[in-house]
Amino acid sequence: VTAGPLAGRIAVVAGATRGAGRGIAVALGAAGATVYCTGRSTRAGRSEMDRPETIEETAELVGAAGGRGVAMRCDHTLPEDVDGLRARLERDEGGRLDVLVNDVWGGDGLVEWGLPFWEQDLGAGLHAWRNGVESHLVTSHRLVPLMAARGRGLVIEVTDGDRDDYRGTLFYDLVKASVIRLAVAQAAELAGHGVTAVALTPGFLRSEAMLDHFGVTEERWRDGVAADPHFAISETPAYVGRAVAALAADPGVSRFAGRALSSWVLAREYGFTDADGSRPDWGRWFADVVQAGRDPEAVDPSRYR
């Protein structure tokens, strides 16, 4: 058995319960890493998201992929919870941390669309900010010192979008733009410490929640295209997961410091594919079809996969 490119590496995926976080954790496991899968949803109890996926399930998938998965409940908005995670890394891994993925979101159900911000629920918007930005800052504040002390490491801030275009509703936009800015700021401050920080976005993500939204399974995902033709360019969480694994295995990753990267650009850079062997290019589709105002049903989606 050949050791994976990340054998012996220690990763934390904060927000590994479902969606991009789960895809990232599993891809890191497939590359041989030990992956701490953290979040609030466990077999003992659900988070406010009230969904069935759990961190234990993700850790088992990491193991099945060839890595070592460790599930640990952690509310990343609470410094004391993240301190507990750091203490466990110090105890069980000698304080080693090679890859930190800040993927916590927790904003579905808090973000409102179609209303001006002043008519939206302020408490819900601030809660989305706390879940989606404060959690990242708390986690980096407590865990980045482990990397800086060793003079090496990679921080990946998972966001939505790699451009400055407005995302349609204020609180959502503020959270996702701030996550990119966190990567920029961390990259600047960590440059002299051997640690690289980047932001990373998936395209149109076929998460568990998105499949539920369209009323389809992963096996029958194309049935959702009738409801939204843009869904034809969607991608599985494995795609952004493979992007993270490729970055983590790249000894020259510092060339990307402070950049907002995407699954589709990195697929071209590193040559990986989505789970079905295709390469969905949401960026090109967005430019050619969405921004150009073309009828998506008149465009052949296979040219963008």
Regions found by a protein language model. Give the residues of each.
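Short-chain dehydrogenase/reductase
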Residues: T2-G95, W105-W118, R305
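Active-site loop of short-chain dehydrogenase/reductase
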Residues: R9, G67-R68, G95-L97, M147-G161, ...
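A glycine/serine/threonine-rich, flexible loop-to-helix segment
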Residues: D50-R51, L115, G192, F204-H230, ...
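Conserved internal alpha-helix within the Rossmann fold of NAD(P)-dependent oxidoreductases
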Residues: G125, G132-S140, L154, D164, ...
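A short, exposed helix-loop element centered on a Lys and neighboring polar residues
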Residues: S140-H141, V184
